[in-house]
């Protein structure tokens, strides 16, 4: 039940706050900035954490082996992997590859 409650709250947040989310960068281009972690979940299949984060009102998605608490801000450098839609709600989301995270 707690997972469903968490997912429902996240869906509502994405629907309201990130409705106007835009893609950042072109595919294959390097990007950098400061992101705030919005959601995370651990995939036991890949043994990695999947993160959804906010960059100036736009959603990004990436994988990382380190656990980062939700709400924490991180500086990042990465390459744009793909442009797509969020899995919970149809808003624009940029998938990143080769992500390096730094302290803010």
Task: Give, region by region, the residue ranges found by the protein language model.
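Structural detector for short beta-strands of small beta-barrel domains
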Residues: 2, 8-47, 74-80
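Small/flexible residues
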Residues: 5, 38, 50, 63, ...
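Compositionally biased amphipathic helical and low-complexity segments enriched in hydrophobic
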Residues: 11, 23, 60-61, 97, ...
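Beta-strand/loop nucleic-acid-binding surfaces
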Residues: 47-72, 84
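OB-fold/S1-family single-stranded nucleic acid-binding modules
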Residues: 50-56, 79-104
